[in-house]
């Protein structure tokens, strides 16, 4: 798996790597992810801050990143937690646990999330 942490401004190819990771984390109020930064965007007549252009709220809403935390330490902790769910090697299986979730449980939201008529929204 690929894990990426946005610990500051991430632009261009680095932004693509962050967005294509299996799990990605940004630091709120510190990180920004964009193809081109504010100076480049200003050349086409739009003056935007780093946060307006690619702050954590925009990236979470668009699905470009998976998580946002308050500090760099929390970002590393989140990455460690994600990796803790995986085996140490491709030659090992993940630990199995007995789920306490009712296997017959239904979720109305999931049932309604995909319309029965795929031509309607």
Functional labels for PLM-detected ranges:
Residues 71-121:
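Terminal amphipathic helices with adjacent charged low-complexity linkers/tails
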Residues 1-91:
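Conserved catalytic cores of soluble enzyme domains
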């Amino acid at each position: 798996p690929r894990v990426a942490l946005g610990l500051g401004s991430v632009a261009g190819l680095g932004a693509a790597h962050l967005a294509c990771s299996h799990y990605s984390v940004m630091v709120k109020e510190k990180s920004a992810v964009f193809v081109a930064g504010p100076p480049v965007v200003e050349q086409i007549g739009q003056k935007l801050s780093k946060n307006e252009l690619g702050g954590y709220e925009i990236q979470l809403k668009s699905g470009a990143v998976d998580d946002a935390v308050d500090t760099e330490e929390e970002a590393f902790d989140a990455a460690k937690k994600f990796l803790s769910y995986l085996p140490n090697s491709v030659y090992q299986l993940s630990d199995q646990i007995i789920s306490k979730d009712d296997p017959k449980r239904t979720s109305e939201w999931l049932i309604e999330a995909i319309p029965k008529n795929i031509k309607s929204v």
